[in-house]
Design a protein with these regions (language model features):
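Core beta-strand elements of the Rossmann-like FAD/NAD(P) dinucleotide-binding domain
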Residues: 4-6, 116-125, 162
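Short beta-strand "acidic-cap" motif of Rossmann-like dinucleotide-binding folds
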Residues: 29-35, 43, 128
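N-terminal Rossmann-like FAD-binding beta1-loop-alpha1 element of flavoenzymes
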Residues: 4-33
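Glycine-rich dinucleotide-binding loop and its adjacent helix/turn
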Residues: 77, 130-162
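Glycine-rich active-site loop/strand segments that organize a redox cofactor
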Residues: 30, 41-83
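Short hydrophobic core segments
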Residues: 9-11, 120-134
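A conserved short coil-to-beta-strand element within the FAD-binding core of flavoproteins
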Residues: 98-112
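Helical element adjacent to the flavin cofactor pocket in flavoenzyme catalytic cores
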Residues: 79-96, 102, 160
Length: 162
C-alpha cells in the first residue's frame, strides 16, 4: 500500500517536468512533481564551465513564457538558462518536492507506484521527464584499458580536469 496517492506523478523538475506541470494545471489535473535535486539540477551540476546554449535566444521559450534576452541572435550562458528555468518555475508554481529521488517505478492494479527513499506514491499515470542522457554511455572497449583517462560530458567542467 502506497503512503500517498496522486492522479499524475511527474518525475523530473527541469524544463520538461515544469512544462508538463503547467499543462496539467491548465487542465485541472491533480499532480505532483518530484525532483531528485533542485529545479534545473542538471543545468547546475552536469554542465561545463563556459557552456553556451546551442540555440539562438529568439528560439528559447517555454509555454506561455518567453525568454528575456538583449540579443535575439545571441547565445545565452548556463547561468541565464538556469535563471530562466527558475523564473518559469515561479510562474508555473508547480506542486513540487525537491530532494526526492524515485528509486523504482512499478505497475500495480491502479496504475503505478513510485518507490522513494522514504516511502511510496501511487499514481494513475506517470510522466517521466528526466531527460534522455542520465547515464553516461561508454564503449565496452575502454574496459580493456583501465589506465586510460576518460571524462564524460556530464562530469566535465573545464580544461584543468584534463
Amino acid at each position: 500500500m502506497a503512503d500517498e496517492t496522486v492522479d499524475t506523478l511527474v518525475i523530473g523538475g527541469g524544463q520538461a517536468g515544469l512544462t508538463m506541470s503547467h499543462r496539467l494545471k491548465q487542465r485541472g489535473i491533480g499532480h505532483l512533481v518530484l525532483e531528485r535535486g533542485r529545479i534545473a539540477e542538471r543545468w547546475r551540476s552536469e554542465r561545463w564551465d563556459g557552456l553556451m546554449f546551442q540555440f539562438p535566444n529568439w528560439s528559447v521559450r517555454l509555454p506561455d513564457f518567453a525568454f528575456p534576452h538583449a540579443d535575439a541572435d545571441g547565445f545565452s550562458d548556463t547561468a541565464a538558462i538556469i535563471a530562466f528555468i527558475e523564473d518559469y518555475a515561479t510562474f508555473v508554481t508547480p506542486p513540487i518536492r525537491c530532494g526526492v529521488e524515485v528509486t523504482k517505478l512499478r505497475r500495480d492494479a491502479g496504475g503505478f507506484v513510485a518507490d522513494l527513499a522514504g516511502g511510496s506514491i501511487a499514481a494513475r499515470s506517470v510522466v517521466v521527464a528526466t531527460g534522455p542522457y542520465q547515464r553516461p554511455l561508454r564503449p565496452a572497449l575502454l574496459d580493456d584499458h583501465p589506465g586510460l583517462f576518460q571524462v564524460h560530458a556530464s562530469s566535465y567542467k573545464n580544461p584543468a580536469q584534463l
